[in-house]
């Protein structure tokens, strides 16, 4: 998941910022859902990770929290944040991990709709005040999701 590259993300999560940041919470829950599902399916091969601890909370608990807290963002009149887009990308990946193709299509659809609504496929429409790290994160997310869309069309 190269679109979660930012060095500040682990720090934000370790400090518990996701508990009070309504933009960070859903993407954190979505990331936890994917990791937990991959651990459960024995698809994680990082020796330093404590697989037992990562298995304690079912993936669906994180997934449902991410879905619940991301609901309603469709009604926002504001531009969609990078974390909102990441959340939908991660939910789509987790749905693939669960074998739920319809849900994968739902979250891919939300992602691509929001990108289209704000013209975020064009870097000139991105916020002007983002730094190099966020610019690269956005580029990686766009590339990754274009690849997923292509793969999903083959389903």
Name every feature range the model reports, one short phrase each:
Residues 1-155:
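Acidic, Ser/Thr-rich, low-complexity intrinsically disordered regions in fungal proteins
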């Amino acid at each position: 998941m190269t679109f979660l590259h930012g060095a500040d993300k682990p720090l934000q999560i370790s400090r518990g910022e996701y508990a009070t940041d309504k933009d960070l919470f859903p993407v954190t829950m979505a990331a936890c859902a994917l990791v937990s599902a991959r651990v459960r399916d024995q698809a994680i091969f990082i020796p330093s990770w404590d697989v037992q601890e990562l298995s304690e909370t079912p993936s669906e608990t994180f997934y449902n929290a991410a879905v619940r807290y991301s609901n309603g963002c469709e009604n926002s009149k504001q531009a969609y944040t990078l974390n909102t887009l990441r959340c939908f990308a991660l939910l789509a990946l987790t749905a693939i991990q669960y074998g739920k193709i319809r849900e994968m299509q739902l979250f891919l659809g939300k992602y691509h709709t929001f990108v289209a609504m704000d013209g975020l496929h064009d870097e000139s429409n991105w916020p002007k005040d983002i730094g190099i790290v966020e610019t690269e994160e956005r580029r990686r997310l766009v590339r990754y999701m274009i690849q997923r869309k292509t793969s999903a069309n083959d389903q």
